């Protein structure tokens, strides 16, 4: 159990180190407003905090820096909510001012603005595309033998896929096909699209549309591409280059390589957990992230779908600011997407 004096000193050290990235000494602490202890007393308390594992001594300075245990204690017990200034709020609100239709546009813009506001790397997962439901299906001919299939989902997600038309496929056939597809597929999830096509739609197409047997295989690969496409959005991938902890290019390269692997990126998230979660250093499962902190949260799209947000930075992350920003943006995203679905 830490004393009140130790708590106060630990908080000052961590707050100062987050701002400066420089070891914090006793004289520096003694000059802080609200600190009434002598440098000698502070040195003794710092030595005790080091012995308890909350601080570490560097080789190049007599000052101390927080340990991973120190950061964990700080996050769990000393982190106080930080207000967001009007400029930050205005920048966040700009995400929603354009009245963009597609969910992906809003998520991509959110990733960029989060990285700008935090100076760290942001990653946003879109909602699970497989759970989207078909809202509208259309086919637009581009030439006598080529067309584009367009699927619009209930979340505003739009997919376009080119394919070749069968020989002798007429405009009348195309119109009949689009009507049948919309009649049978609206409300069907992309996950169930193939099953619905094969179980219900194909037989109807064969009755009313010439070359239906030839047409279906041509569109099947396009549907597979839609379902398998991962929706991950990045902001500020190279922001870590600006942090003194990552002047070692090998460390940065390892993290960038991790971000290129979809399964590794998805493992950073806890999509089934609500609230904000902070993992520090070795608490991350990935070896590449041992010098990083990862803060994650989720946002909702209606009652049945979720997306997720992660901020990646050094363990010397400005936790107060990141948590405050994530708290605002996750609620704003949820509100915006819920409103869009109800309209």
From Swiss-Prot:
Tree of life domain: Bacteria
SUPFAM superfamilies per record: GAF domain-like (SSF55781), Winged helix' DNA-binding domain (SSF46785)
GO biological process, one term: negative regulation of DNA-templated transcription
GO terms for MF: DNA binding
InterPro entries (UniProt xref): GAF-like_dom_sf (IPR029016), HrcA (IPR002571), HrcA_C (IPR021153), WH-like_DNA-bd_sf (IPR036388), WH_DNA-bd_sf (IPR036390), WHTH_transcript_rep_HrcA_IDD (IPR023120)
Presence of the UniProt keyword Protein transport in the record: no
Keyword terms: Repressor, Stress response, Transcription, Transcription regulation
Task of the protein: Negative regulator of class I heat shock genes (grpE-dnaK-dnaJ and groELS operons). Prevents heat-shock induction of these operons.
Annotated family: Belongs to the HrcA family.
Cross-referenced PANTHER family: HEAT-INDUCIBLE TRANSCRIPTION REPRESSOR HRCA (PTHR34824:SF1)
Protein known as: Heat-inducible transcription repressor HrcA
Source organism of the structure: Lysinibacillus sphaericus
């Amino acid at each position: 159990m830490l004393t009140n004096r130790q708590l106060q000193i630990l908080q000052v050290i961590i707050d100062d180190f987050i701002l400066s990235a420089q070891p914090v000494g006793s004289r520096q602490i003694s000059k802080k407003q609200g600190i009434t202890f002598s440098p000698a007393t502070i040195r003794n308390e710092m030595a005790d905090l080091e012995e308890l594992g909350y601080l570490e001594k560097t080789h190049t300075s007599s000052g101390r820096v927080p340990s991973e245990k120190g950061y964990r204690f700080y996050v769990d017990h000393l982190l106080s909510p930080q207000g967001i200034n009007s400029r930050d709020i205005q920048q966040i609100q700009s995400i929603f001012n354009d009245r963009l239709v597609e969910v992906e546009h809003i998520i991509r813009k959110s990733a960029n603005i989060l990285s700008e506001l935090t100076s760290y790397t942001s990653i946003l997962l879109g909602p699970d595309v497989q759970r989207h439901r078909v809202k509208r299906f259309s086919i637009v001919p581009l030439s006598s033998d080529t067309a584009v299939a367009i699927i619009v989902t209930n979340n505003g997600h739009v997919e376009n896929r080119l394919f070749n038309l069968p020989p002798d496929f007429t405009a009348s056939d195309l119109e009949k096909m689009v009507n049948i597809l919309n009649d049978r597929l609206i409300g069907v999830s992309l996950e169930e699209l193939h099953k619905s096509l094969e179980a219900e739609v194909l037989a109807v197409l064969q009755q009313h549309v010439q070359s239906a047997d030839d047409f279906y295989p041509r569109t099947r690969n396009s549907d597979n591409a839609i379902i398998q496409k991962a929706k991950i959005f990045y902001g500020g991938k190279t922001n870590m280059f600006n942090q003194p902890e990552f002047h070692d290019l090998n460390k940065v390269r390892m993290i960038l390589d991790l971000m290129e692997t979809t399964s590794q990126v998805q493992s950073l998230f806890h999509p089934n957990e609500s609230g904000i979660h902070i993992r520090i250093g070795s608490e991350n499962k990935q070896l590449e992230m041992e010098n990083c902190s990862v803060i994650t949260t989720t946002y909702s799209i209606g009652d049945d779908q979720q997306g997720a947000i992660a901020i990646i930075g050094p363990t010397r992350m400005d936790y107060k600011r990141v948590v405050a920003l994530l708290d605002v943006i996750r609620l704003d995203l949820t509100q915006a997407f819920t409103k869009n679905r109800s309209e």
